[in-house]
């Protein structure tokens, strides 16, 4: 248990931030799962529609400090790479 006033305040602040971060990361997880589901079903049009939502959620989390900017860039790059692989596979076949 916290002994000082400042320690009590830090506990409250860290809990508030934890909740905010969970919401932001939850959005990223939800949209990413939707995106990957559409890719696995070869529903590329739907995947293209939801990709801006995923990228927006990732960028917002990075901007607010929930994700490091390099982590955000890596996640976005990975998603774009998967989409481009599916597109090239569909064009070649």
From Swiss-Prot:
Database matches in Pfam families: Ribosomal_S20p
Protein name, UniProt field: Small ribosomal subunit protein bS20
Free-text function comment from the UniProt entry: Binds directly to 16S ribosomal RNA.
Gene Ontology CC entries for this record: cytosol; small ribosomal subunit
Residue intervals passing through the bilayer: none
Keyword tags: Ribonucleoprotein, Ribosomal protein, RNA-binding, rRNA-binding
InterPro entries recorded: Ribosomal_bS20 (IPR002583), Ribosomal_bS20_sf (IPR036510)
The organism's taxonomic lineage, starting at the top: Bacteria, Pseudomonadati, Dictyoglomota, Dictyoglomia, Dictyoglomales
Family label: Belongs to the bacterial ribosomal protein bS20 family.
Gene: rpsT
GO BP term, example: translation
GO molecular function: small ribosomal subunit rRNA binding; structural constituent of ribosome
């Amino acid at each position: 248990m916290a002994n000082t006033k400042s320690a009590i305040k830090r506990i409250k602040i860290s809990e508030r931030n934890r909740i905010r971060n969970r919401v932001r990361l939850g959005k990223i997880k939800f949209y990413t799962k939707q995106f990957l589901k559409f890719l696995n079903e070869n529903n590329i049009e739907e995947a293209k529609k939801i990709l801006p939502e995923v990228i927006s959620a990732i960028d917002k989390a990075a901007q607010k400090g929930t994700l490091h900017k390099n982590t955000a860039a890596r996640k976005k790059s990975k998603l774009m790479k998967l989409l481009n692989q599916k597109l090239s596979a569909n064009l070649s076949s």
